[in-house]
A protein has these predicted regions:
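Short secondary-structure boundary/capping segments
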Residues: 34, 58-63
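Mobile cap/lid helix-loop segments that gate and shape the active-site cleft of serine hydrolases
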Residues: 62-100, 104
């Protein structure tokens, strides 16, 4: 994906871009910070998931906590594809991002 994003920038005549990610989309910003720093001018994280993946209580609560039936959290957590992605196919170690890895202007919004 990083190659595709940098190729997209080059195709449009840009060497750098400002990237915005929301929730799961912040994982792509994490990849850009780690593997294509030269293509990143600035970052905007909206409700990021990539910063606290090393805190076991946060990830454990999403994977194992049973929310109240009928709530939005219940619907999201019990969706077959969301459940499979988080429990079986989520690249935790690739997505986690530490502040030291960000070397460009960055803004984080948490809702």
């Amino acid at each position: 994906m990083v190659r595709k994003m940098t190729a997209m920038l080059a195709y449009h005549g840009f060497s750098k871009g400002t990237f915005i990610g929301h929730s799961y989309g912040t994982s792509w910003l994490s990849y850009m910070c780690k593997y294509a720093q030269s293509a990143v001018a600035a970052l905007l994280f909206l409700d990021p998931i990539c910063f606290c993946l090393y805190h076991p209580h946060l990830t454990k609560s999403f994977v194992y906590h049973q929310p109240d039936p009928g709530s939005v959290a219940f619907i999201v957590r019990t969706d077959m594809m969301v459940s499979w992605t988080i429990q079986r196919a989520f690249p935790w170690t690739w997505i986690v991002l530490f502040l030291e890895q960000i070397r460009v202007p960055c803004t984080v919004f948490i809702g």
